[in-house]
Structure formats: C-alpha cells, structure tokens
Regions:
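Cytoplasmic-entry segments and transmembrane alpha-helices of multi-pass inner-membrane transporters
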Residues: 17-51, 96
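Interhelical loop and adjacent transmembrane-helix boundary motif
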Residues: 134-184, 188
Length: 194
C-alpha cells in the first residue's frame, strides 16, 4: 500500500503542472510534449519493464522503494496528464487572468483560482494513479523484490507457486475497491455538474 500511496502523491504533482503548462502554451511545443508524456502508454509494458530493469541494474535501483515508486509513477503519469488536460479544456483561463491582474502571482493564481476549479479531474487523476500502481504487475516483476515486493508481485508468485484461497479473497477486495473508487468518482462528477 505504501508504494501506491507514494505513487499517487508523487505522480500527481508533475503531471498536473505539465497539463497546466501544455494548456497555456501555444505553437507546436505542446503537441510534442504531450506525445512525450504519453510515451509510457504507447510503448508495451513489457518493453518498459525490461528497459527499466536494465537501467535500474546500472543505477542500483532494483529492489528499492525509490525504484518501484519511480517505475509505477512513470506508468501512471500519462493517465494523470490526460485526465487533468481534459479538465482544463472546460476551464476558463480568464478567471486566472483576472486574479493575476489583481496582483496575484502566477503560482498563487493557479493554487487559489485554477486548482480548486479543476479539483474533480485532479482527484480522478490521483485515483487513476493509485489504481494503476495497484494493478501494475509487469514492472513489479522486474524491479521489485526482497523487502520491497509489491502486493501484486506477491499475489502473482502465490498464484504460480501455491494454491491458497487468500489470493481469491484479496482479488475480490481489489475489484470491490476499484468499483467503489469508480462509483465515488462518478458520484462526485455528477454532483459537480449540478
């Protein structure tokens, strides 16, 4: 759970700022950067896992918490960028401009005007990052181990090595958690529209 919590928090800061920057930029640069942020979705997960393993072997990050969190965050970043960018499309930037014309700095205007108005996409993005980390088994098989084996890796190993009803119970709980988070997200977005 600690991997998913850290991944959820770490994954949201950079992509939220990236989506905001892409939204405010003009020209060709936003399209190129947007494609860059989507690369982990475009490349097959097994190739990302092998590449991550080889890179981590050279850097000494295999079987470390920092390595696992970084790998999980890399896989979740595209989902956060897409979700926040779609939320920013319906946001009127004139509101932030007004705040800045009244003396607020750009960071203060973003934190006090823009961020509260895009909170539903931000919360949804955080939940997606959490669920992505929860579900990411391919990369975990390559970079996690020892004291830092993720729950999904332990479940995969248990399914492979032993027959235990605990895995079925945990899987049911994970599905129920995912459905509950999805329902909460839908309920929150309906409340926001009204």
């Amino acid at each position: 759970t600690r991997f998913r919590n850290v991944t959820g928090v770490q994954t949201c800061a950079l992509p939220i700022l990236a989506a905001y920057s892409l939204h405010t930029m003009s020209g060709r640069a936003p399209r190129v950067l947007y494609a860059f942020f989507l690369m982990p979705l475009i490349v097959p997960a097994i190739l990302v896992a092998i590449g991550t393993f080889l890179l981590y072997a050279q850097l000494g990050l295999n079987n470390t918490m920092a390595g696992i969190v970084l790998a999980h965050a890399t896989m979740a970043i595209p989902l956060v960028v897409i979700t926040v960018a779609s939320g920013l499309k319906s946001y009127d930037m004139n509101q932030e401009m007004v705040a800045r014309s009244l003396g607020a700095s750009r960071p203060r205007a973003f934190l006090t005007v823009t961020l509260p108005q895009i909170r539903i996409p931000v919360v949804t993005a955080a939940l997606l990052a959490f669920i992505t980390s929860l579900d990411e088994v391919t990369i975990s098989l390559f970079v996690a181990g020892g004291d830092y084996a993720t729950m999904t890796k332990r479940m995969f190993n248990a399914l492979r090595d032993e027959i235990d009803p605990t895995i079925a119970a945990i899987s049911t709980l994970l599905v129920a958690l995912s459905v509950a988070l999805l329902a909460a997200s839908q309920f929150a977005s309906r409340g926001e529209r009204r």
